Amino acid sequence: IFEGEYLNGKRNGKGKEYYDNGNLKFEGEYKNGKRNGKGKEYDYFGNIRFEGEYLNGDRVLVHISFNNKIK
């Protein structure tokens, strides 16, 4: 499930993705339908598992978190 901004039918701007259980999966920025800019990924149970930056859908700056502790 996606909640956020669209431009010309593509995800663009700030948005959030959710798992089927309703928990947040990703929150961050999109450009031309792809993750682009700052974002956070969460596991199925709501724990942060990645925080960093994306470029054209790829991770380019990574801060990985295990058990909610940034490493």
Q: Where do the PLM segments sit?
A:
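Glycine/tyrosine- and acidic-biased, solvent-exposed loop/turn segments at the edges of beta-strands
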Residues: 1-71
